[in-house]
A protein has these predicted regions:
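Structural recognition of the conserved hydrophobic beta-strand(s) that form the central parallel beta-sheet
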Residues: 62-67
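A glycine- and Lys/Arg-enriched "phosphate-lid" helix/loop adjacent to the NTP-binding pocket
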Residues: 79-122, 126-129, 145-149
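Conserved substrate/cofactor phosphate-moiety recognition/catalytic segment
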Residues: 15-59
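Conserved glycine(s) of the Walker
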Residues: 7, 12
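Phosphate-binding beta-loop-alpha motif at adenosine-nucleotide cofactor sites
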Residues: 125-140
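Short, well-ordered alpha-helix to beta-strand connector turns
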Residues: 24, 60-61, 77-79, 126-127
Length: 151
């Protein structure tokens, strides 16, 4: 099953990918694994050719792909997980994270808040599972894997 893990910056996508990898599962992060590129408008988008090729690979078990981009609606994911967190948690994670500098400037934080108001409601409508990520990544992974096993 091809599983999309999506959500706003700071929602815990990368942390969940790391936990899934720790468990030996195939998990990819759009921000870290060369699946994203800058667009002409200054934002980042997915290299849909690379993402589609990855999703087309045959393999045993689940394939997890984490990221958030306008292009995600056009790709053949079988299951969509939306990660969310309270605003104050998102902002604190953005201010203190070391793996990715996005979200540390006031302008970027304002963009995340705008996306939270405008984009997250759209993601909720297409999500098969919505999880608040105030729990540790290990617990979030447990819930995701349990729900997938029930399908």
């Amino acid at each position: 099953m091809r599983v999309l893990i999506t959500g706003m910056s700071g929602a815990g996508k990368s942390a969940l990918v790391q936990e899934l990898r720790r468990r030996g599962l195939r998990a990819f992060d759009a921000d870290e694994d060369g699946f994203s590129e800058p667009r002409t408008d200054g934002r980042w988008g997915w290299r849909t050719d690379r993402v589609a090729a990855l999703l087309g690979e045959q393999g045993d078990g689940h394939l997890f792909f984490a990221g958030c981009s306008e292009e995600q609606a056009t790709l053949p994911f079988d299951y969509r997980v939306l990660l969310t967190a309270p605003v104050e948690v998102l902002l604190e994670r953005l201010r203190t994270r070391t793996s990715n500098r996005y979200g540390q400037s006031p302008a970027e934080q304002a963009q995340v808040l705008a996306d939270l108001a405008e984009v997250e409601p759209l993601l909720r409508r297409s999500a098969d599972l919505v999880l608040e990520t105030t729990e540790p990544p290990e617990r979030v992974a447990d819930v995701v894997l349990r729900r997938l096993a029930e399908r």
